[in-house]
Amino acid sequence: MIPKDPEAVLDYAWNWANWLDTSTTPNESIIAHTVTVPSGLTLDSSTVIDGVNTAGTTITNSQVVAWFSGGIAGTTYRVECLITTSAGRKDERSLWITVQER
């Protein structure tokens, strides 16, 4: 779980750089994404950026970054990110953000 203060506006990321198929030309990339947040936490914005895989290679459009604000202290929120890739694959990953006074 990732901590967040109720007053903080912070960015969190989902990195698919190791999961995307880089054996093709051009490399598979994220072409669409949806970030879903439960009531009480606010999604301020989200975007797709380049990410880095474990080999240290930059992979174009392989990471989703989302900015969150708000939340109720003592509450844990499950935030979901669904992507669609240029190869037509879909994947969903979750983050758990725990809001606490810091």
Describe the residue ranges of each PLM region.
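A short beta-strand micro-motif common to beta-rich folds, especially ectodomain repeats
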Residues: 75-86
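Extracellular/luminal low-complexity segments enriched in Ser/Thr/Pro
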Residues: 65-73
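C-terminal edge beta-strand
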Residues: 89-100
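Low-complexity "stalk/linker" and mucin-like segments enriched in Ser/Thr/Pro/Ala/Gly
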Residues: 38-61
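Short glycine/proline/serine/threonine-rich loop/turn segments at secondary-structure transition edges
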Residues: 24, 72-77
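Predominantly extracytoplasmic/ectodomain segments of secreted and cell-surface proteins
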Residues: 1-28, 32-33, 100-101
